[in-house]
From Swiss-Prot:
One of its GO terms (cellular component) is cytosolic small ribosomal subunit. The gene is rpsC. It comes from the Bacteria. Part of the 30S ribosomal subunit. Forms a tight complex with proteins S10 and S14. Belongs to the universal ribosomal protein uS3 family. GO terms for molecular function: mRNA binding; rRNA binding; structural constituent of ribosome. Pfam families: KH_2, Ribosomal_S3_C. InterPro entries: KH_dom (IPR004087), KH_dom-like_a/b (IPR015946), KH_dom_type_2 (IPR004044), KH_sf_prok-type (IPR009019), Ribosomal_S3_C_sf (IPR036419), Ribosomal_uS3_bac-typ (IPR005704), Ribosomal_uS3_C (IPR001351), Ribosomal_uS3_CS (IPR018280). Keywords: Ribonucleoprotein, Ribosomal protein, RNA-binding, rRNA-binding. It comes from Borrelia turicatae (strain 91E135). PROSITE patterns: KH_TYPE_2, RIBOSOMAL_S3. Signal peptide: none annotated. This is Small ribosomal subunit protein uS3. Residues 39-110 form the KH type-2 domain.
Amino acid sequence: MGQKVHPYSLRIKINRDWKSKWYFDKKLYSEILHEDFLIRRETMKFLKGIRFDISDIEIIRNNLQRVTVIISTPRPGSVIGVKGANLEKIGQLLTRKISKKINIKIKEIKKPEFDAQIVANGIAKQLENRASYRKLLKSSLLSSISKGVQGVKIKVSGRLGGAEIARSFEVKEGRIPLHTLRANIDYGFAEAQTTYGVIGVKVWLFKGEVLGKQTNSDAGQVINKKTSREKSEYFDKNRVDDKSKKVVNDDKFSRKKLEFGSKSNSSFKKKNGSDV
């Protein structure tokens, strides 16, 4: 499981949620899934000029005839347009495509350095502008680390710098615990369309752990671990108590044993006719 590139699949309902939220009859599943794909494709096609500013498109359905589309972006003004012109055009376009009422909402990303998709989009955009990939990756990594991200890993693959043979280049800072399911790891992927071909950009961001290691579910408080001194005192105390209990039990056992032994000796002497 540690070889999984995309960390979301193992963390659904742990610290990640579905990007399409709806539940309908299984007969309608394929149709609605195709509509979701169509909504995302047409939205990105319409916003092609600012596609690098789009982080995520979330789809929520409460009934068959109403669809809510939430677009996450660090620049909501460029998506909304002048007096909401872009939103109105996108709504009309999607309504014609799927024949359902579309409600579009904008979600602002206040910290772009904490969003892996935005970081990947920024790198891809600068690669298309012929920026040096080595300096670009290092500057993006340092920018995220300086903002408080605990771990960053960036990987680019393709004909880097116009080389004839495709290869990969990777930079990493901090830790990326892919095996730890409580770790909040964000992932983003983008493609840079260069004159030499397509360059893929992958970004992993570790933003801390969302679930504690030891928690008390009843009280909702963190359980403090005992120090080694407290542990030794605790075990010494229990060991003394156990010994004292053992001694008491041994005394009772020995007393019973003596009584049983005296009775058995007296009965043996009576049988043999000797005096007690």
